[in-house]
Amino acid sequence: MKQTLRIAILSAFACAALAAFSNFAQAQKVDFAFGLSTLEAPAANSTGPSLTGGTYPGFSGDVLFWHNFGIGGEIYWRATQSNYASIYGTIPYRPLFLDFDGIYEPKLASHTYLELSAGIGAMDTRQYCSECGNGYNTNYTSDKHFMGDFGAGLKFYPKGGFFIRPEAKVYLVTNNQLFSSSYATRFGASIGYTFGRH
């Protein structure tokens, strides 16, 4: 994993941990999870290729403070590089999605919760080449765009604090001119653990 990706992951979890531990006595619960997903987006067109496909591993965390409301964050990235056809030839690329959300998590039934989220973040598309980078031993350039997102998941607790969460999230990316559309939908599942009541 490249150093920038490690820093992004560490920053996301540091923010969640800081919020969690500074108000742990007031928090109803704290979740941490690892997930695997894929993306679905409009087909490739004259604007650019589609973001559809690929495996996206990622980490997420959230803290619920008041009743069923809280905050959370997540980072998902494409596990393998894909290829972007340009006038300069084929360029390998890898998208990364980082967001911070408001969370609402009502209980539906015994050991089952609905998780609704909406927030803001960024899509970072890394384009790899031997001649590019920032002079600090990186072999990519980075194209970042602001995004909004919203999503839902069903959280099942089969045993204790361990949970399984099938989920979907829609990303609305501004000025995403490298690809066929300004939106993409992530479908996947996460496994994680809840600290506190559930």
What kind of region is each of these model predictions?
Residues 1-29, 196-198:
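Cleavable N-terminal export/targeting peptides
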Residues 37-58, 143-144:
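Surface-exposed strand-loop-strand hairpins of Gram-negative outer-membrane beta-barrel proteins
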Residues 44-48, 83-91, 133-140, 174-179:
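Extracellular loop and loop/strand-boundary signature of outer-membrane beta-barrel proteins
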Residues 153:
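Catalytic Tyr-X3-Lys helix of short-chain dehydrogenase/reductase
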